[in-house]
Regions:
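Extended, low-polarity segments enriched in aliphatic/aromatic residues
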Residues: 2-53, 58-239
Length: 239
């Protein structure tokens, strides 16, 4: 696999997201999923729907999310839909909670630590994906961005428990009693991300926004305020 060419701009605007996407030279085909973080209730740092409107309109995408595996405002479809409305996502976009009905299994025959991934069943409805990530810290992964979006983010509630425990359980109630060492968790994220990336067979693009960067993830209801200056926007393809 060739090294990915990564584009960078210091400009962090609605327009710069479109410009850097177009620099990639790809047109995402068919039904386009836009994977982003809807933001936990109480979190102040997630990317706002107004900020990403131009790029989502540009790719004619559907915002996709999956339910969480821990207590909060996003661990059931009913609560997650209310959160999406309160954060304004469905004011501007079609929004699909991909595991609202069920999940499906993706095999990872060459996985390093896990051999399968449980993802929202609606993933099969999409031909392409734009992974639109907010770069920030993460308590288990070190930082949360594209890798976390593809792995934890696309995983169903059961899949999130499976990745966090490196395959020990799909039961969210048993998740916190079965946490692995950090390196194994990161390897499990990489395995899960790889199978989702490969599913789209090149019809996938990545944009990472480095603004409002906190040590805490957007999944934290009580997050630290940003602790460093904004940096810019990254975009890349991995074929």
């Amino acid at each position: 696999m060739e090294k990915a060419k990564v584009y960078f701009t210091k400009e962090i605007t609605e327009e710069s997201l479109v410009k850097i996407y177009e620099k990639l030279g790809i047109e995402l085909k068919g039904n386009v999923a836009v994977k982003l973080h809807s933001g936990e209730e109480g979190n102040q740092n997630y990317l706002r729907p107004e900020f990403v409107k131009n790029i989502i309109d540009r790719v004619e995408g559907t915002v996709v999310e999956c339910n969480t595996a821990y207590d909060g405002a996003r661990n059931t479809t009913e609560k997650h839909k209310k959160l999406i409305t309160s954060h304004g996502w469905d004011k501007y976009y079609k929004v699909d909670i991909m595991d609202s009905e069920k999940d499906i299994t993706l095999d990872i025959p060459n996985g390093l630590v896990i051999k399968k991934d449980y993802v929202g069943s609606h993933l099969d409805n999409y031909d392409s994906m734009l992974v639109l990530s907010h770069f920030k810290g993460h308590p288990m992964g070190g930082y949360g961005s594209a890798l976390k979006q593809l792995s934890i983010g696309v995983a169903s509630s059961r899949g999130k428990a499976y990745i966090h425990t490196v395959g020990k359980t799909t039961d969210a109630n048993k998740l916190w009693d079965n946490l692995p060492e950090q390196d194994k968790f990161i390897e499990a994220m990489a395995d899960a991300a790889s199978v989702v990336h490969n599913k789209f067979k090149g019809n996938i693009a990545y944009i990472n926004v480095m603004k409002n960067m906190s040590v805490d993830c957007d999944c934290c209801a009580k997050a630290e305020d940003p602790c460093m200056q904004d940096i810019g926007v990254l975009a890349s393809l991995i074929q």
